[in-house]
Amino acid sequence: MIIVLAILAGIIGIAGSILPGLPGTPVSWIGLLLLYIWGPEDMALKTLIIWGVVVAIVSVVDYIVPMYFTKLTGGSKYAERGAIVGLIAGIILTPVGMILGSFLGAFLFELYYTRQGAAQALKAAIGSFLGFITGTGLKTIVAVLILWKIFVFAF
């Protein structure tokens, strides 16, 4: 039963790395924690701590990277907020909708609120989008690696 819960936590962690509003990598790490406490194979505390630190770092980086990319391209906080609003609205339209929604949200918010023109809004939207993709990619990679570790320690 613990193995099933650990694997389920790993899968939910991957989904949460992609979908906004769901915790991602921390849930994956909980799967490792379950196996550390009750798993069939001995896992070193060092392994659990290292993955915990990786999860903490990726969680912080996920908040910093979109802001960095947006500012790098001259965007404002409105582009960041628009990307989040567009992403959430795009969930209804599948993963493609999430990506397009994030981009369009950043573009429209930047265009409307800063009134600096379409060229600047486009640059900000590209920066916000690249930041979102980078953060999501990092979280997803870590969540997949943790799920792999869960399988290694479970079987």
Enumerate the language-model features and the residues they cover.
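Alpha-helical transmembrane segments of multi-pass membrane proteins
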Residues: 13-16, 35, 54-63, 90-94, ...
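Interfacial segments of multi-pass membrane proteins
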Residues: 27-43, 85-93, 104-113
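C-terminal binding/interaction regions
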Residues: 113-155
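Transmembrane alpha-helix interface/packing and boundary motifs in multi-pass membrane proteins
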Residues: 10-27, 86-97
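Short hydrophobic alpha-helical membrane-embedded segments
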Residues: 1-8, 26-27, 73-84, 120-125
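Short, amphipathic, aromatic/basic-enriched membrane-interface segments that mark the entry/exit
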Residues: 1, 15-22, 66-77, 113-119
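Helix-adjacent hinge/juxtasegments
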Residues: 46, 50-90
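Helix-coil boundary and interhelical linker segments in multi-pass alpha-helical membrane proteins
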Residues: 1-4, 37-50, 152-155
